[in-house]
């Protein structure tokens, strides 16, 4: 049975792991040599070499590096986990709406890692419909075949739109489909990404 008081407790031996940690410091700063690291830390080459050869753990340098570069303290210390701290990853907060009985209900916001979001979003929102989450864009140049957030007589829903000749469209749901004039509906947003929860 574990006697650890903390779920993420890490045991650090001050006399072990120094070589690997110093190599991670070089990588985190973007240097190519340990000499460049020594110059940046304003320590002599012999001081750094001594810690490296004795495998002495450089806790003070690791803290400095984490503060200066935003590199994950866990990665610098152990080499495990993500190199970049979650605190420095670019994020974007999007307004969230929930579809309930055909109504769009404001429901806070979601924060996403920016790299997760589709490119070129101009006016993004998140729509939650049951177990499905949609990342949508309210700004679009034209309506093409695909899935859209639409408003029909005050009822909002996610539907597949297929353009037909003479200003007509086909609207498809999982249960049925029908045709109507494009002018009969309001297209609110384009569905750019779909996330399904189990």
From Swiss-Prot:
InterPro entries: Lambda_DNA-bd_dom_sf (IPR010982), Phage_CI_C (IPR032499), Phage_CI_N (IPR010744). GO terms for molecular function: DNA binding. It comes from the Bacteria. Pfam families: Phage_CI_C, Phage_CI_repr. The keyword Signal does not apply. GO terms for biological process: negative regulation of DNA-templated transcription; protein complex oligomerization. Keywords: Transposable element. The keyword Transferase does not apply. This is Protein ORFi in retron Ec67. It comes from Escherichia coli.
């Amino acid at each position: 049975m574990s006697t650890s008081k903390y779920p993420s407790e890490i045991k650090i031996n001050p006399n072990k792991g120094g070589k690997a940690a110093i190599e991670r410091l070089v990588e985190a700063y973007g240097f190519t040599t340990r000499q460049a690291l020594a110059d940046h830390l304003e320590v002599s080459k012999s001081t750094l070499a001594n810690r490296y050869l004795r495998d002495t753990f450089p806790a003070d340098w690791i803290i400095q590096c984490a503060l200066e570069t935003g590199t994950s303290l866990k990665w610098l210390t152990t080499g495990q986990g993500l190199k970049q701290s979650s605190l420095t990853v670019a994020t974007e907060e999007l307004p969230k709406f929930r579809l309930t009985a055909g109504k769009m209900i404001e429901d806070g916001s979601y924060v996403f890692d920016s790299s997760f979001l589709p490119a070129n979003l101009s006016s993004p929102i998140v729509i939650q419909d049951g177990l499905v989450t949609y990342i949508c864009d309210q700004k679009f140049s034209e309506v093409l075949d695909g899935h859209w957030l639409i408003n029909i007589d005050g009822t909002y829903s996610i539907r597949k739109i297929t353009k037909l000749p003479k200003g007509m469209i086909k609207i498809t749901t999982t249960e049925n489909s029908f045709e109507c004039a494009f002018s009969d509906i309001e297209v609110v947003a384009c569905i750019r990404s779909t996330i399904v929860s189990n």
